[in-house]
Each structure stands twice: as C-alpha cells, then as structure tokens.
Amino acid sequence: LMTLIIILAVAELTFRTFLKKFAACMIIFGIWDIFYYIFLKIYLDWPESFFTWDILFLLPFPWVGPVLAPILLSLSLIYAGVVILVEMNRGYHFQIDKRFWIMEIIAGIIIIISFMINGIVVINQTIPASFPWIIFLVGLFFGLVVFHYCLVKDSNVLSDP
C-alpha cells in the first residue's frame, strides 16, 4: 500500500493534468515492479526463471502467476505511459471518452482473472499446474489494441515524418 501511495505522490507532485499523472503512475509502477524482480534475483537468487510462480496479491483472493506475466504487464504500462507523456509534450491532446476507459477496465479485469484463476490452488497450499496464458494475453493485447486505437491512431506516433 505504501508503495502505491509513494507512486501516486510522485505523480501528483510532478504533473498537472490527470492524464499525465496517470501516465507517470503507469511508468513508475512498471519500473518499480521490474526492479523488484531484479533485486530479488540479485539478493536472493530468486526467481529461478521467468516461469517461476509468484504470489502477486492476497486480496480479495490470491493472485498468482509466473514472474514473466507481471513483467510483460509492467513493460506494457511503461510503453503506454511513455507514449502518452511524449505525445502530450509534443502538444497532442488526447480525446479519451468513456468507451476507452470501459474497454481498458475490461482488459484489466481479464488480466486480473488470469491471475486469480489459480488462487484456490494456492489456498490449498499446492503449486498450480499451469497458468492461463491465453486469458492473460487476451487481456494484455486487448488493452494494447484499445490503447493504440483510441490514443495512438490520430497522433502520428507510428508514422514517419
């Protein structure tokens, strides 16, 4: 909880607009999450691999998945946050409507479901047999496609000058 409060405080103190603050939170959280695993590897020699199981959250139900899943999610957050900040600093004004937020929330819920599916297995003190990669990747790619469609398509980020 304190980590999230610090991330929110840094974003609040750094930027004025909601979208820039939100983008900063995405970047900071993504970097923090990746370095969390880097330092665990340096100091504890854990995880053994990108496919080592990790308990991500415990509320309201255990969220579990291989280390690679939150790293992919963090890289996606960093990417989206950087695109938003770079384009806004170039003067682009994003037109975000309610549909965008609804679709991104749906993508997030799909990802959360992929982490919670094996929660009961962990409660029973066993290691899950497999991770629902298809569900996770559907949520991740849906979120990225929505991002590109609603934010990037008109900003010329991906086109040559």
Residues covered by each model-derived region:
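Alpha-helical transmembrane segments in multipass membrane proteins, preferentially the mid-helix core
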Residues: L8-L13, L73-Y92
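Membrane-helix boundary/juxtamembrane motif in polytopic membrane proteins
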Residues: M88-G108, T126-S130
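Interfacial segments of alpha-helical transmembrane regions
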Residues: R16-I31, H93-E104
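Membrane-interface loop-to-helix entry segments
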Residues: L1-I6, L58-Y79, I134-I135
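Transmembrane alpha-helix/helix-exit interface in multi-pass inner-membrane proteins
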Residues: G30-E48
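Membrane-interface capping segments at transmembrane-helix boundaries
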Residues: V83-Y92, F147-P161
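Juxtamembrane "helix-exit" motif on the non-cytosolic side of transmembrane helices
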Residues: K41, D45-W46, E87-M88, S114-Q125
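Non-cytosolic membrane-interface motifs at loop->transmembrane helix junctions
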Residues: F51-L59, I123-I135
